């Protein structure tokens, strides 16, 4: 509009007056700009005065304390000072003031030993300088005390110089998150964190020895076993014993209360126990596969030889009463020795054979044994029964192969049969080739003074009164006597455990039986075990009981004086490594400045920084 009026008026005036008119117009415009600038400066001065008046209200007693210096990085100081000079709007400063006030109110409300009250919090004025260009001597000069007049002058000068916003935010995050800004600050804040404040991260992991396990320490138990006397067991009536076996109830009330009270703990122990058994089974399968892979054809040849000569390759840790000549001779009504005279040509499935009786060791009273006996046999893939109590008289004798019987005059066999009529026989067990030991066992078994009732002579546990680790094996041995050799069955808490092959392992020998707990667990495997023995001499059952108690072993909690020095590098920052051999555990004794399992973390500094209103202050902890 000025230009339009000037153009219209210039057309009417003379050309000599034009320079004077332009000078007057420029002078008027200059006056308007001066008035606007003066009003802006007055507003800025008023805001600065309000800020200086507001500082003593928030923090009391700050002028009495000595000043501290805060080193700033050269990059942040230079770049942020230029940006602060360019941005000078009053709205941005007012919003930043509100944010800083909120942060300070949060700091005062923290529940800690160092920030519990305002008396412990001391705000100290500080001087801002460039850390990159200063020397240690210059830093010491800044730390010196400053008179009150010089402090006021420095505050006025610092108020004109604005601290970069990124530095303020980084120092506030440093205070809020206990001196560990890298864990809580955003990626934008991490760019302004000094490298010295970052937590130390080890470059490489120490190499542990081959015998060290990284898994947590295994629990251990003190095993105590004692045999229960018969007086403690005869108090119960037979009806109560039968009811407890049928219902599965536990007469020990304290144990039942303990189970109901710690049901969740028992379930967790059972899950751990099951998991350990599964891991052990996997390891056993892998070991078996490795052994089979190494053996190769040699293992296959051994298997073929065992199939052809089964009796020669029986397992030594297993006693089969159904293959004991004494057991068969005592159980069979008729026992004789003979040779095969003829056999069927086709012996693939079923065949018959004629035997000539050479010697009779035992015979039925009502029937006379003929000289030639016709017997029937059948082939079976199974090796037959191992328990004499499960062995039955069969019309056909079971054989693994037709080649097991040889037709020769110098090869005799011992037969255990029952004569149903003069021409028919049932066979007990398998034909047994005659040797000196077989003849001696049969002659002893058919004698009149052979029988002896079964008896349990001793029962004990291995180990006893010793420490066993969780998941290891526990053995319970039961020694028996009697003729014929007794059969042993195992019970736990009045319940049979003979079918629990996944939890227990049984090794039956001629005069003793071993119960092996595959993976011992105190909650499920501790209790009362019973060994019962019987034989065919009488119906009486001999029994003995043993109580297994497992008490958890507690190692000393003060590990500063326990353990032996490690022979490998495990701890960081000059930490001392110690090892406890009993539980295979490694721990570190850290210096005062570090903490953690391997001394990998550093304690935060006791000084915290607060940056607000263009100034940087220090918040100290009084310990």
Curated annotation (Swiss-Prot):
Residues 305-316 have a biased composition (Basic residues). Keywords: Developmental protein, Disulfide bond, EGF-like domain, Glycoprotein, Growth factor, Immunoglobulin domain, Secreted, Signal. Residues 1-40 form the signal peptide. Disulfide bonds join 478-531, 566-577, 571-588, 590-599. It is found in: Secreted. GO terms for molecular function: epidermal growth factor receptor binding; growth factor activity; heparin binding; receptor ligand activity; signaling receptor binding. Ligand for the EGF receptor. Seems to play a role in the global proliferation of wing disc cells and the larval patterning. Shows a strong synergistic genetic interaction with spi, suggesting a molecular interdependence. Required for the development of interveins cells. This is Protein vein. It comes from Drosophila melanogaster.
